[in-house]
A protein has these predicted regions:
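Transmembrane signal-anchor hairpin modules in multi-pass inner-membrane enzymes, especially those
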Residues: 1-92, 128, 135
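Short hydrophobic alpha-helical membrane-embedded segments
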Residues: 26-34, 82-84, 107-108, 184-188, ...
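Hydrophobic, membrane-inserted alpha-helices
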Residues: 35-39, 61-62, 87-90, 113-116, ...
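Membrane interfacial helix motifs at helix-loop boundaries and amphipathic/re-entrant anchors
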Residues: 37-55, 92-109, 148-184, 221-224
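Hydrophobic core segments of transmembrane alpha-helices in multi-pass, intramembrane catalytic enzymes
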Residues: 52-62, 105-117, 182-198
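Structural signal for the C-terminal ends of transmembrane alpha-helices
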Residues: 60-73, 118-128, 194-204
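Transmembrane alpha-helical segments and their membrane-water interfaces
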Residues: 94-148
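Alpha-helical transmembrane segments of multi-pass inner-membrane proteins
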Residues: 134-162, 169, 176-224
Length: 224
């Protein structure tokens, strides 16, 4: 096997140490969840190419991070056979789809997030994953309700870039930064489960966890 020169070897070892560290894994996990939850807002503000660039960079970084700590990673659960079958079936639908290129683009998008999700599952334990989702969901819910207050109560206008109609002052369902009330409602329900898990596992201060539950409950009610 060809060995790199010593000076390059030192750089490679340093890079592997950094990319394989717990801090980098935490940052990449948070960035992945944040990108997934903010995909609509990102696509509407920086465009599809901008979102694609973010996803490509994330895939490259998580691939390098996974390679750097491969020896320390073990499968923590059984292989999700049902998910694998669903993914395979989804890809097979390309052959009889009337919109093959659109199907290929959508399935590639799904595959990217599948890879990113597998990375999180491999490098973080359950409590760490819950905390990652909890932190990101608190952020997106606070941003959503803040923008709804600004558009619906303060300025009484819409925010077309994020499809926020400013309905808070008219008692109509709000959309937040997710583009639709249904999407916001789903995120709020997931947030409620996540925050309740944080409270039960005591992975977050009690007052902070209860406040998060109240926030998610309010957002869920306003999205109906």
């Amino acid at each position: 096997m060809i060995q790199p020169p010593p000076r390059y070897r030192a750089i490679i070892d340093t890079g592997a140490t950094v990319l394989g560290s717990a801090r980098v894994s935490s940052v990449l996990s948070t960035a992945t969840v944040g990108t997934a939850l903010c995909a609509f807002a990102l696509r509407n503000t920086i465009g599809g190419p901008g979102l694609l660039a973010i996803l490509v960079v994330l895939v490259l970084l998580v691939g390098a991070s996974l390679a750097a700590q491969w020896g320390n990673i073990g499968w923590r659960a059984l292989v999700p056979i049902s998910l694998m079958v669903f993914t395979l079936w989804s890809w097979l639908t390309i052959f009889w789809s009337q919109y093959q290129w659109a199907s290929l683009a959508a399935l590639s998008y799904m595959l990217v997030f599948t890879v990113l999700g597998i990375y999180i599952a491999l490098v973080r334990d359950t409590i760490q994953i819950v905390r990652t989702f909890g932190d990101v969901m608190r952020f997106v819910l606070v941003v959503s309700i803040a923008l709804e207050i600004l558009t619906g109560l303060v300025f009484d206008t819409s925010f077309k870039a994020l499809a926020i109609a400013g309905n808070l002052g008219s008692a109509e369902p709000i959309q937040g930064i997710f583009g639709s009330r249904n999407q916001l409602g789903v995120i709020a329900v997931i947030a409620l489960i996540t925050f309740a898990t944080e409270l039960r596992t005591k992975s977050l201060q009690r007052g902070y966890a209860i406040g998060s539950l109240v926030l998610a409950g309010v957002v869920l009610a306003l999205s109906q």
